[in-house]
């Protein structure tokens, strides 16, 4: 059986490193477990480290910069970072316009769609527009 491709957005990748006050932590980390078992192939976009780092530095956690650097190094070791192609960015712009998304959120959806992957997200707009699935739903699908 081949691994299921899963693109994780920053809302999911953040849970791999930070749990206080976060939802779906166990499910997000469950995707990592399935990755280690080679049941899924996890990928993030090249913009994910910026989003995760910013959330840790400027968000609720207020994590010191030296620890954010450690997290970003760990993220780079966990899974590949994908750079969207020009075509995928074009699709992202169309999705952003159609669904009222930010371009960077739409980029996750466009890359996942173009590459035949599932998008793991906790972003309300992506979920409401059917562009991604919660980590718990993806784990459920995997059985």
Question: Each predicted region: which residue ranges?
Answer:
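Alpha-helix capping/helix-boundary segments
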Residues: 12-13, 48, 88, 108, ...
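Glycine/charged-rich beta-loop-alpha catalytic/anionic-binding loops adjacent to active sites
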Residues: 33-37, 73-76, 91-94
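Active-site neighborhoods of divalent-metal-dependent phosphate/nucleic-acid chemistry enzymes
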Residues: 79-118, 122
